[in-house]
Amino acid sequence: MVTFSFLSALVLAALPYGLAAPSSLTSLINHETVAPPTHLESRQGGYYSFWTEGGGSFKCSQQGGGKYTCSWSGQKGGGFVAGTGFKPGGSRAVKYSGTYDAKGPGYLALYGWTRNPLIEYYIIESYDIIAPGEPWTKKGNFTFEEGTYELYTSQRVNKPSIEGTRTFTQFWSVRTEKRVGGTITTGKHYDAWSKAGMKLGNHDYMILCTEGFANGTLLPSGSSTITVS
């Protein structure tokens, strides 16, 4: 496990402007399972997703207009991902606001996938404990008008993806000062990743998600209410 600069103290380690949500936001999909699926696109759903695995109490619902709510209390082996977003993903200004009160491992993050190459990526906005499942490699940091982020990569071997069970790379941008609400200009992160040698492929979907998961004896709990535009 690498030593993180601003993460060294950790263990192991939304915004309804206007009257209507954009047409690219949808509340039609609420896909829920109790075991890992074989195809992550089915698991994640698309524009709105709610996926769970293992034990624990994970309750998330789409409220319409780009808003979703979650409450969770995990146990060993449990986890969930829920969020609202866009398909395809890509360069855009994602505005969000709301509340996020979390304990244990998990994130409030913009989460997405690309193909060719197959990349799973996170832009992490807030968290309690970051407890990566795989070792992270630091790739640098960057600062712009929205804040300072540290960059990491990791690799997952023979895990579920939007292309079935595959080995793929994960990209991470992690804020040095946590926030809940603001604008995420995704293109700025894509550019910073590219300069660090982190090359994305063709964009599939992306969501502003709440995620919680158990890691050893560390268990997640909390609540969130997030609106995305």
PLM ranges: what are they?
Residues 81-104, 161-168, 186-207:
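Short, surface-exposed loop and linker segments with low hydrophobicity and enrichment for Pro/Ser/Thr
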Residues 76-79, 102-106, 117-120, 179-184, ...:
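Short, surface-exposed beta-strand/loop "edge" segments at domain boundaries and coil↔beta transitions
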Residues 81-144:
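Extracellular-facing segments of soluble proteins and assemblies that are Gly/Ser/Thr-biased and enriched
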Residues 180-229:
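Long, compositionally biased interface segments
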Residues 116-180:
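An exposed acidic His-Trp-rich patch
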Residues 43-47, 53-102:
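Short N-terminal edge-element motif at the start of the domain
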Residues 58-61, 65-73, 146, 150-152, ...:
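Generic recognition of long tandem-repeat/solenoid scaffolds
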Residues 1-41:
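Fungal secretory targeting signals
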